[in-house]
């Protein structure tokens, strides 16, 4: 089971936030995450794994402040220890930065690059945020593998279409260049012929 929430800011469209029911489900979330996903977890404490799905083309720096705080509050609220504390640090990083090795426990992860891990601090619990998110909560039993494959398939098709469009434009540019070269060549030829014609005319002039 995966829990889904909706978050939005004044200046952006809605974002999807999701988290697994337990550490075993987290394994599938880690395995079938998307490149657009940002992973959240309470720093140095046990907590839920919360993911934010960015819009295509966005980066971690583009996360609206309100949406960032929604994710941070949600992960804090789903930490047995963190939910009782103030000034809790929450780490977040792109899904692609998560590292999972065979010797790690269920639900445990590391990072490929520590420099890509960011921190946001939740000073204290804000019920207004949690209540608003709770109203958007949905429970689903998704086929994460199938959804990931569908997403990857669409991306492959988009890239294929982009390559085809690029080739079409290159072909069009080459055609235009060839036509311009032919036109210039024809113009030069006409110029030479005109000059020859004028010279022939001058040679035959007779002055009385």
Swiss-Prot record:
Positions of post-translational N6-acetyllysine modification: 23
Chain positions covered by the region annotation Disordered: 145-208
Chain positions with Phosphoserine modification: 204
GO biological process: positive regulation of cell motility
Domain of life: Eukaryota
Keywords carried by this UniProt record: Acetylation, Cell membrane, Coiled coil, DNA-binding, Membrane, Phosphoprotein, Transmembrane, Transmembrane helix
Chief location: membrane
Cited InterPro entries: Jlp2/Ccd25, NFACT_RNA-bd
UniProt GO molecular function: DNA binding
Cytoplasmic topological domain residue ranges: 123-208
One matching Pfam family: NFACT-R_1
Annotated stretches, region: DNA-binding: 21-25
Coiled coil: 117-187
Subunit record text: Interacts (via cytoplasmic region) with ILK.
Protein name: Coiled-coil domain-containing protein 25
Taxonomic source organism: Bos taurus
């Amino acid at each position: 089971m995966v829990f889904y929430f909706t978050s939005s800011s004044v200046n952006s469209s809605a974002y999807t936030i999701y988290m697994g029911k337990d550490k075993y489900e987290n394994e599938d979330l880690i395995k079938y995450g998307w490149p657009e996903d940002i992973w959240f977890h309470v720093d140095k404490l046990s907590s839920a794994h919360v993911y934010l799905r960015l819009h295509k083309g966005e980066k971690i720096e583009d996360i609206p402040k309100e949406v960032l705080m929604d994710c941070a509050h949600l992960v804090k609220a789903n930490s047995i220890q963190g939910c009782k504390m103030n000034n809790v640090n929450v780490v977040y990083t792109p899904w692609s930065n998560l590292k999972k090795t065979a010797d790690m426990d269920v639900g445990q992860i590391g990072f490929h690059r520590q420099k890509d891990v960011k921190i946001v601090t939740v000073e204290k619990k804000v019920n207004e945020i949690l209540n608003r998110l709770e109203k958007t909560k949905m429970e689903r039993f998704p086929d994460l593998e199938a959804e990931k494959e569908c997403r990857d398939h669409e991306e492959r098709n988009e890239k294929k279409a982009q390559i085809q469009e690029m080739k079409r434009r290159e072909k069009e540019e080459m055609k235009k260049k060839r036509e311009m070269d032919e036109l210039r060549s024809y113009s030069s030829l006409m110029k030479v012929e005109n000059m020859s014609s004028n010279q022939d005319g001058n040679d035959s002039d007779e002055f009385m």
